[in-house]
A protein has these predicted regions:
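N-terminal intrinsically disordered, cationic/polar leader segments
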Residues: 1-167
Length: 167
């Protein structure tokens, strides 16, 4: 029985740059801390990419997700994403497959309890949140939060006894 050649580990002489090789939609649990030191376990959706040198054919994609488990049992932060990229780089370097740059994005729904303006009823509001880290010359880090907003039409609020419609 013959073995299958590991072509991704062979040199590529065509000089084609693979600027973005990776995995998308990898779900993993995370524990996030808010500003009051409360914690919440969320489901993170990870997209992890690396850029390759022109003489490389590919990367070990399993290395891109191997490190996620390490961070599932700790409080997750932006610094953990930087640590994850460094762990991936170390593994790729050990395999002789260094990358030119990397980026990781994790998105998740974070819930906060809010009170309704008039009834004071409490309910959970989900916020779309995300962390994004790039490991390249810039070392870019970003945090994103999408806040749901609805406003009330001032005219209908003025003429209504029972509330107003949203805009």
């Amino acid at each position: 029985m013959s073995t299958l050649a590991d072509v991704q580990n062979q040199s590529d002489t065509r000089g084609i740059i693979l600027g973005k090789v990776g995995v998308t939609g990898v779900y993993h649990p995370l524990t996030i801390r808010d500003k009051t030191t409360e914690t919440q376990t969320v489901t993170g959706k990870f997209d992890i990419f690396v850029g390759l040198h022109p003489d490389q054919r590919g990367a070990h994609l399993s290395h891109l997700v191997d490190g996620l488990h390490k961070y599932a049992s700790t409080l997750f932060s932006m610094d953990d994403l930087v640590g994850l990229i460094k762990d991936i780089r170390s593994k790729q370097d050990q395999e002789g497959i260094p990358f030119t740059d990397a980026n990781i994005e994790v998105t998740f729904k974070y819930f906060l309890e809010k009170s309704a303006p008039s009834s004071e009823m409490k309910s959970l509001v989900g916020y779309d949140c995300g962390f994004h880290v790039e490991l390249n010359g810039s070392g870019h880090k970003a945090v994103s939060v999408t806040v749901p907003v609805s406003t009330v039409c001032p005219c209908s609020q003025e003429i209504s006894d029972n509330g107003a419609h949203n805009q």
